[in-house]
Amino acid sequence: MTMPVNGAHKDADLWSSHDKMLAQPLKDSDVEVYNIIKKESNRQRVGLELFASENFASQAVLEALGSCLNNKYSEGYPGQRYYGGTEFIDELETLCQKRALQAYKLDPQCWGVNVQPYSGSPANFAVYTALVEPHGRIMGLDLPDGGHLTHGFMTGKKKISATSIFFESMPYKVNPDTGYINYDQLEENARLFHPKLIIAGTSCYSRNLDYARLRKIADENGAYLMADMAHISGLVAAGVVPSPFEHCHVVTTTTHKTLRGCRAGMIFYRKGVQSVDPKTGKEILYNLESLINSAVFPGLQGGPHNHAIAGVAVALKQAMTLEFKVYQHQVVANCRALSEALTELGYKIVTGGSDNHLILVDLRSKGTDGGRAEKVLEACSIACNKNTCPGDRSALRPSGLRLGTPALTSRGLLEKDFQKVAHFIHRGIELTLQIQSDTGVRATLKEFKERLAGDKYQGAVQALREKVESFASLFPLPGLPDF
């Protein structure tokens, strides 16, 4: 028997094979990819994940992410699609929007939300596109001082971020002695620069932001205030840190960090009455909704990732539970325990501690840097990232390590466990200093890595790695059973 396909006849066995291919599980369909995923799953299970920007999504979130929603294309917004067959997609997106407002206790008459951004960076760029004309002026925390690449980073010789390419950016800074944001200098510079938008957001800053002060500065300059709460969105939802919504015009976030969802983004914007005309008494309404929605689609994106929106909706439901609130309090408690333990071991913590989920360890007093420490810790199954510290002269040799507690807290680690984690880190940095003394302080990072991989230090690396992996394996890894 044969079947006609595009004018040709295909053997029935081929179609049978085709149908079998569509029904095969990954482990049978693509062994190479399956094995890579299994290796990564094992790395996460036996290692200590200390990236401040990472977390372990729940099984429910990952199931939604891997659902049939991946198949559906749906350009547009609920009730205004360019494709048919979207009644359930509309239902899903509307539910996600409703939950987003509920999770942050927002009045739907005063706030709206776009849940279509593919991630945090597109969400930020959509806001800039909507509210700041090309070559308009933006102020954000400088990347070496704890800001984010999308907040306008540029060097003296090159515009690095698209934000700095298409808009004019002036960074604000932290005080190099204290590590705290210098709000006085920000206020003074804003009066000279006259930004259209000020960004209240960080990627490596361990203290709460003064949103009231930032709003005052924004108002003095006729600027919008946008919070990028990507790192702290879960903490905000749980009421563990101050909320940006009281003072900001717009709030953006990713959904996979402390919120513990899948990788996506959201943009919250004010609605309703903005002010009242003093002469006419007429209400002036915000127009942010139409500007932001049109910037996301059709301005910068095509069809939304409906499977990701489903994952975000699930995460938002979880974020409204008592269990989630307890988890977020534990994230902060664990971070303080880690900070205190490292301080007792002789390490300098930038700003002297933390109000949130991360700390920045300044290694200059130890005589080493973040790049070398990062490589040694990675070899010992401790995952974290190098980061610039206030006062660093070069981003190519950052002095610090950024450490975060959300992921390991999701695995069930408590304060006493993070004290052990601190000692593992300490042993790794001591090993870093041994290798560095052997190679010399002027050795390149490449030369350092070669010495690290040599026979002389592999015994010490293996011994520490085995202890780390034995400890990490005591705690369950959230997610799908097979991965």
Swiss-Prot record:
InterPro entries: PyrdxlP-dep_Trfase, PyrdxlP-dep_Trfase_major, PyrdxlP-dep_Trfase_small, Ser_HO-MeTrfase, Ser_HO-MeTrfase-like, Ser_HO-MeTrfase_PLP_BS, SHMT-like_dom. The keyword Cytoplasm applies. Keywords: Cytoplasm, One-carbon metabolism, Pyridoxal phosphate, Transferase. GO terms for molecular function: glycine hydroxymethyltransferase activity; pyridoxal phosphate binding. Pathway: One-carbon metabolism; tetrahydrofolate interconversion. The modification N6-(pyridoxal phosphate)lysine is found at K257. GO terms for cellular component: cytosol; mitochondrion; nucleus. It is found in: Cytoplasm. Disulfide bonds: none annotated. It catalyses: (6R)-5,10-methylene-5,6,7,8-tetrahydrofolate + glycine + H2O = (6S)-5,6,7,8-tetrahydrofolate + L-serine. Pfam families: SHMT. One of its GO terms (biological process) is glycine biosynthetic process from serine. Homotetramer. Identified in complex with ABRAXAS2 and the other subunits of the BRISC complex, at least composed of ABRAXAS2, BRCC3/BRCC36, BABAM2 and BABAM1/NBA1. HAMAP family: SHMT. In eukaryotes there are two forms of the enzymes: a cytosolic one and a mitochondrial one. This is Serine hydroxymethyltransferase, cytosolic. It comes from Pongo abelii (Sumatran orangutan).
